[in-house]
Amino acid sequence: LALAPAFGVDLAVDVAETDPNQALRAAIGTKADVVVDVTAKAPAALGQAVSLARPGGTIVLAGTRGSLETPGFDPDHIVYKELRILGALGVDVAAYRQALDLLVTGRYPFADLPRQVAGFDDLEPLIQVMAGDRPGTPPIHGVFAPDARSNNKGPAT
């Protein structure tokens, strides 16, 4: 989260430690115009997104729940608040092209993000941690390099 401002984030909150509604209210005194949810396997995030959005606001869902249950989510609030909900699946060729174009601009410090490099021996555990199927903190940047011999954690070099 410490790197979030370098990527243009106005407010980044670890919801495991801080109530996002209180943090948003303290930061801007109102609800958000746009809430972007990119969490994976976080069923409660949808309810939080609806709570954080202002009436007439927009919620972008780019993370999948991994569950049919959504604790704290009341669909009626979408109607009452007249929210716009957009789904975003960013795993097509056009999205990869845009991502690569953004990387080469140097606009954001991607090289400073913590990463983990995995070879064939470490790939399965890395994918399991990133999918939430194995205990551990998933890296922000997971890299498969067939010739990698060990895990590298920390900023990219």
What are these regions (language model features)?
Residues L1-L3, L68-P75:
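Short, glycine/polar-rich helix-capping loops at beta-to-alpha or helix-loop-helix junctions
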Residues L1-Q48:
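Adenosine-nucleotide cofactor-binding segment
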Residues D19, A42-P43, S67-L68, D92, ...:
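Glycine-rich nucleotide phosphate-binding loop and flanking beta-alpha elements
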Residues T39, G63-G66, A88-V91:
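Short strand-turn motif at the edge of the Rossmann-like AdoMet-binding core
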Residues G47-S51, D92-T157:
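C-terminal hydrophobic helical "lid"/dimerization subdomain
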Residues A53-P55:
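Helix-to-beta-strand junctions that scaffold the AdoMet/dcAdoMet cofactor pocket
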Residues T58-V60, G72-L113:
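Rossmann-fold dehydrogenase core element
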